[in-house]
Amino acid sequence: MAGHSQFKNIMHRKGRVDAVRSKVFGKLAREITVAAKLGVPDPAMNPRLRAAMLAARAENMPKDNIERAIKKATGGEGENYEEIRYEGYGPGGAALIVEAQTDNRNRTASDVRSAFTKAGGSLAETGAVSFMFDRVGLVAFDAKVADADAMLEAAIEAGADDVKSDESGHEVTCEHGALGEVAKALEARFGEPRRTALVWRPQNTVEVDDETGEKLIRLVEMIEDQDDVQNVFVNFAVSDALMARMQD
């Protein structure tokens, strides 16, 4: 699968997550707290909170950490985070969307801008690249839960728009407002998904050469290393050879 799926595989290459586990847990805890504050602290009634808890479990975040993050929201503890979207261009003109949660807008903007500049990219105005992407709901399952035909049939019945299946798994996409209902229907059929999220899906994926691809990957790593950054979405794809090298 091209686009964000391939990129996620790069960003979670062997050893990287382990090296920054505390940072990963911190970002997951922040999303859980924000989701619980914006909705209700019950994941059965709050699709965003459920998705955040699912992501935390996928990273083996301890149950105590998850419960503590929810209590911060219900007890009125912790900072009040503002959700901000940044858009920009990387080497080769590739488009990037950055989602952040911050208690200091100026600090976060400075950090993100610095990462773009150091990598030869540029931070742009809001709306500069988002028109190249679609905001969609994503529900992902391991390949073993069903064959491609069964997943397609179930996804259509659940109200999804598209399904992509290969040896790495199944990705079901839907209108962003329908994510909760689609995810619930598919979970009843196939069990808990490995990921449920709102994502920015590129309308077209740009193939880049290995030199440019490596620069872009480094750029996204620099951005993701910022504590306030939650997600990075891109519209480029790299060669299998480069992906293999970067995963070593």
From Swiss-Prot:
Q: Does the keyword Ribonucleoprotein belong to this entry?
A: no
Which Gene Ontology MF annotations are present?
A: DNA binding
State the InterPro entries in the record. Answer: Integrase-like_N, TACO1_YebC-like_2nd/3rd_dom, TACO1_YebC_N, Transcrip_reg_TACO1-like, Transcrip_reg_TACO1-like_dom3, YebC-like
Keyword list, A-Z = Cytoplasm, DNA-binding, Transcription, Transcription regulation
Where does this polypeptide localize? Cytoplasm
Q: Does the keyword Transport apply?
A: no
By its UniProt entry, which Gene3D superfamilies does this protein fall under?
1.10.10.200, 3.30.70.980
Q: Name one GO cellular component term.
A: cytosol
Q: Which organism is it from?
A: Methylobacterium sp. (strain 4-46)
Q: Which GO terms describe its biological process?
A: regulation of DNA-templated transcription
Specify one Pfam family: Transcrip_reg
The protein's name in its UniProt record: Probable transcriptional regulatory protein M446_6579
- The secretion signal range is none
Q: Which family does it belong to?
A: Belongs to the TACO1 family.
UniProt superkingdom = Bacteria
